């Protein structure tokens, strides 16, 4: 069952869901909590690898990812990150989110931003039960104009569902969890599959 605003506020108050820094009530509406854009970004460096063979040997996949991903880029609150049409970039939410093992979260983009061509998650919008960390955003500009993204802007909304029971293998207990406790714009770790 999806949590309504009153349930979200109660779960935050009781510490069942933790969002740091805690959002004020103006950012909680209906069935969601607005999340803000953080300061860390990563971009793909052009022409540094001819392709990435996703089913190739792990060492080769890892080396190719290292070649194409930039180091983390820090954008000050007063600055903007420009996402050009057709570009993919990684960013991170300002908030860190911790979920118990019986709640799953979902990240949705904002309709107003989507109408300008901005996708905030390419496909990965589920936040697993047991998750703890900041949420990586997979930005894609499908529009025709460059978009200026400013740290601190409302970038998406989280909503939460209670599950039929507690997960037997929540994210924080899995030994193979690749992004456990992530705090920055972590690049793909597909080579660890």
Swiss-Prot record:
Catalytic activity field: dCTP + H2O + H(+) = dUTP + NH4(+)
Entry-linked Gene3D superfamilies: 2.70.40.10
A UniProt-annotated Pfam family: DCD
InterPro entries registered for this protein in UniProt: dCTP_deaminase (IPR011962), dUTPase-like_sf (IPR036157), dUTPase_trimeric (IPR033704)
Cited CDD domains: trimeric_dUTPase
First-level EC class: hydrolase
Keyword Nucleotide-binding on entry: yes
Chain positions recorded as dCTP binding sites: 110-115, 128, 136-138, 171, 178, 182
Keyword line: Hydrolase, Nucleotide metabolism, Nucleotide-binding
Active site: 138
EC numbers, comma separated: 3.5.4.13
Domain of life assignment: Bacteria
Record keyword Hydrolase present: yes
GO function terms (MF aspect): dCTP deaminase activity; nucleotide binding
Gene Ontology terms describing biological process: dUMP biosynthetic process; dUTP biosynthetic process; nucleobase-containing small molecule interconversion
Pathway(s) where this gene product acts: Pyrimidine metabolism; dUMP biosynthesis; dUMP from dCTP (dUTP route): step 1/2
UniProt family annotation: Belongs to the dCTP deaminase family.
Subunit and partners: Homotrimer.
Role according to the record: Catalyzes the deamination of dCTP to dUTP.
Protein name, as recorded: dCTP deaminase
Annotated organism of origin: Tolumonas auensis (strain DSM 9187 / NBRC 110442 / TA 4)
Gene behind this protein: dcd
């Amino acid at each position: 069952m999806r949590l309504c605003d009153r349930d979200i506020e109660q779960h935050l108050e009781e510490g069942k869901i933790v969002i740091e820094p805690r959002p004020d009530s103006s950012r909680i509406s209906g069935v969601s909590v607005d999340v803000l854009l953080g300061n860390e970004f990563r971009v793909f460096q052009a022409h540094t690898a001819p392709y990435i063979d996703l089913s190739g040997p792990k060492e080769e996949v890892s080396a190719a990812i290292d070649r194409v991903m930039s180091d983390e880029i820090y954008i000050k609150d007063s600055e903007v990150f420009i996402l050009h049409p057709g570009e993919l970039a990684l960013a991170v939410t300002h908030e860190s989110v911790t979920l118990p093992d019986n709640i799953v979260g979902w990240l949705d983009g904002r309709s107003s931003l989507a109408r300008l061509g901005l996708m905030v998650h390419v496909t990965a919008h589920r936040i697993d039960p047991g998750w703890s960390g900041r949420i990586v955003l997979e930005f894609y500009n499908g529009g025709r104009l460059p978009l200026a993204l400013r740290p601190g802007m409302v970038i998406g909304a989280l909503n939460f569902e209670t599950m039929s029971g507690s997960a037997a293998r929540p994210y924080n207990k899995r030994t193979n969890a690749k992004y456990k406790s992530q705090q920055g714009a972590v690049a793909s770790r597909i080579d660890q599959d």
